[in-house]
Structures are given as structure tokens and as C-alpha cells.
């Protein structure tokens, strides 16, 4: 199976990226494709293959955090796009598990100070609304983080003997995903959590995430962790990621029933 991987496209600000010359078997869009319904609408009309779609924080801007998922499901209805929010889908024997995975703000050890920093540093807490129309708080997104972590522990650690598992989250599951130069940045607690134990215990073949300041590719236990972001917020603007690859694809080899499997990059 060939899996295309991109994230943080910000199509409403940066325009549509170049498309792969050859459509993969599955396309993984790991969040922040566009604000509101723009990302889902674009993806549904752009890709002819099945699309795994996870929401990033940017998609919720100027929308209701609690109800927006269902609005997007209605938008995607009847298309080849699969919106995963603490959900699992099977495609050609591959198990895909997806969630936004908001952070716990404890990347630097103290969640309380991380939440205070988030309110000051992250514009999500100005522009994303709750059901009462008021700005959401770090406590609101931390509650969603706990729901996702609980789902991932229950689901991803349940062995899947008929194929391999791919986990897709928007926010990063490990501090190892933070690029050099940003590892002391207090804002990093808004896009990554220390979930190394979960990654190792889930033992997925691949964990795709987004929301960081550059490409990611490393092993954590038996799991390959990758990210391929196109753009990153800078102040109130955006800048492009120098090493973004619009055609980034991983191909799965091996037979999971025989306990074999590896990825090659194209």
C-alpha cells in the first residue's frame, strides 16, 4: 500500500499545493488543511483515492469546538473522505486510527503553567468558540485530549492480527517531534505531548502527525513517526516549510500475518 502524507496546507492562505503525479492508494491529511469547511471541501474534490482526514486546531477557528465535527461530517458525506475523531477505519487490510489529540500542556512538566502560557501564546483560545459562543479555554481542549488518549489506549493497544496499524493525529505524541531550536519554546506545549509510552505500547507501524515547524521522521520503539507540514504560523502570519514535499509517499512492504513489514519512502 502506498500512503501519501501531507499536513498544514493552509489552502485558504497559501493556495493549493502541487498534487502527486501518481495518486497513492490512501491519502493522509493530518490537519490544518484549511479553515472551517474549506479543507474538507478541497480534499473531497481533489483526491480520487480514499482520504484519511484529521482535524487540526486551525480548522476550528471561528467555529464551535463541540459541534463543528458533525458539520464537517455533513460536508464530507458521500465523498471518499473519512473524517476520524477518536475513530477507526479499515482500508485494504490496514487499520487507521485517528484523532486531533489536543495536548495536555505538560510538555515541560507543569500543566498549569503550560495552560497559562497557552492562553497568552496561542490564538486558538481567542478564535475558537464553545457552545455558548465564548472563547474556549485550555481546560476545554485538555478534556478533549484526555478523551483521545483514552481512546488510543483502548483501541491502538488492542492487537490487530490481520494487518498493520497507522495512527494519525494532528498534534505530536512526543517531544522528539519538536525541531531543534524550538525545544525550549513554551508554545511547544500547545502542539506536542509526552506520550512516548503510548506510542511504544500501541506498537503501530506508523504514526503520522502535524503541527510542528518542520519535517519529522524517526523511530520510537517499533513505530515510525513522521510529519510533512507545508506551513507554520509565525505571529499572525504563516511561513512555508522549506523541506515540505507535496508528493511525500510511504510504501508498505511485507506480510503482517507473518510478522513482517517495513516502509520505503518515495
List each model region and its residues:
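Beta-strand-turn-beta hairpins that frame and shape the catalytic cleft
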Residues: 1-4, 88-98, 164, 219-224
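A basic- and aromatic-enriched beta-loop-alpha substructure that forms the phosphate/nucleotide-
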Residues: 52-59, 64-125
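Active-site-proximal loop/helix segment associated with metal-binding centers of metalloenzymes
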Residues: 97-166, 173-182
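A structural motif corresponding to the C-terminal end of an alpha-helix
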Residues: 76-81, 151-164, 197-206
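N-terminal active-site segment of His-dependent metallophosphoesterases
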Residues: 1-53, 59-68, 138
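Binuclear metal-dependent phosphoesterase catalytic core
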Residues: 79, 179, 185-206, 212-266
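Active-site environment of divalent metal-dependent phosphoester hydrolases
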Residues: 10-16, 34-39, 58-68, 88-90, ...
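Active-site neighborhood of phospho(di)ester-bond hydrolases with catalytic His/Asp-centered motifs
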Residues: 5-7, 27-32, 52-57, 82-86, ...
Amino acid at each position: 500500500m502506498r500512503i501519501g502524507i501531507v499536513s498544514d496546507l493552509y489552502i485558504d492562505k497559501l493556495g493549493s499545493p502541487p498534487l502527486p503525479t501518481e495518486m497513492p492508494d490512501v491519502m493522509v491529511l493530518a490537519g490544518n488543511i484549511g479553515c472551517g469547511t474549506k479543507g474538507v471541501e478541497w480534499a473531497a474534490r481533489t483526491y480520487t483515492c480514499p482520504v484519511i482526514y484529521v482535524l487540526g486546531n486551525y480548522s476550528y477557528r471561528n467555529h464551535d469546538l463541540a459541534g463543528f465535527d458533525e458539520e464537517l461530517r455533513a460536508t464530507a458525506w458521500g465523498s471518499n473522505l473519512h473524517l476520524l475523531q477518536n475513530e477507526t477505519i479499515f482500508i485494504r487490510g490496514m487499520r487507521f486510527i485517528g484523532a486531533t489529540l489536543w495536548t495536555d500542556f505538560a510538555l515541560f512538566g507543569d500543566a498549569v503553567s503550560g495552560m497559562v502560557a497557552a492562553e497568552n501564546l496561542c490564538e486558538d483560545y481567542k478564535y475558537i468558540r464553545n457552545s455558548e459562543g465564548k472563547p474556549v479555554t485550555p481546560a476545554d481542549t485538555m478534556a478533549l485530549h484526555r478523551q483521545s488518549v483514552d481512546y488510543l489506549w483502548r483501541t491502538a493497544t488492542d492487537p490487530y492480527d490481520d494487518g498493520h496499524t497507522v495512527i494519525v493525529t494532528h498534534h505530536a505524541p512526543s517531544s522528539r517531534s519538536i525541531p531543534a531550536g524550538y525545544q525550549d519554546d513554551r508554545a511547544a506545549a500547545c502542539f506536542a505531548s509526552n506520550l512516548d509510552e503510548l506510542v511504544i505500547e500501541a506498537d503501530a507501524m506508523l504514526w503520522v502527525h502535524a503541527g510542528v515547524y518542520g519535517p519529522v521522521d524517526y523511530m520510537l520503539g517499533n513505530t515510525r513517526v513522521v510529519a510533512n507540514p507545508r506551513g507554520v504560523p509565525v505571529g499572525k502570519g504563516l511561513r512555508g516549510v522549506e523541506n515540505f514535499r507535496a508528493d511525500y509517499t510511504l510504501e508498505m512492504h511485507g506480510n503482517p500475518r507473518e510478522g513482517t513489514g517495513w516502509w520505503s519512502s518515495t
